[in-house]
Amino acid sequence: MVAKGSDFETEIKEEIIVAEPRRFKVILLNDDYSTMDFVVEVLMVIFNKNFDEALGVMLKVHNEGRGVCGIYPYDVAETKVSQVKKKAEESGFPLRAILEEC
């Protein structure tokens, strides 16, 4: 931007700093009732994992009690958690997902 005066011109520079959005991990938690097939389906449908990726995350959830499904900005991560909850309730499973800030 240029400001004009009677005898001079002054250039004013504006610096805009854009911060990176905070990122959140969506984590599936193991339970004793959700089937392995259902967890793989959730990972493929909601998190767009291919079969091999979904199988790997499902096994991590099964063996370690939790597994990271993906890392997203807050609004996307929150939506994914809600989608997991809805699909689990509709299917009669107690599968849960949580958020953790990276």
From Swiss-Prot:
**Gene3D superfamilies in the record:** 3.30.1390.10
UniProt xrefs under InterPro entries: ClpS, ClpS_core, Ribosomal_bL12_C/ClpS-like
State any GO BP term from the record.
Answer: protein catabolic process
Note one Pfam family from the annotation: ClpS
Quote the PANTHER family the UniProt record gives. ATP-DEPENDENT CLP PROTEASE ADAPTER PROTEIN CLPS, ATP-DEPENDENT CLP PROTEASE ADAPTER PROTEIN CLPS1, CHLOROPLASTIC
Similarity comment: Belongs to the ClpS family.
Q: What does this protein do?
A: Involved in the modulation of the specificity of the ClpAP-mediated ATP-dependent protein degradation.
Oligomer status and interactors: Binds to the N-terminal domain of the chaperone ClpA.
Q: What is this protein called?
A: ATP-dependent Clp protease adapter protein ClpS
Tell me what organism the protein belongs to: Wolinella succinogenes (strain ATCC 29543 / DSM 1740 / CCUG 13145 / JCM 31913 / LMG 7466 / NCTC 11488 / FDC 602W)
Q: What is the lineage of its organism?
A: Bacteria, Pseudomonadati, Campylobacterota, Epsilonproteobacteria, Campylobacterales
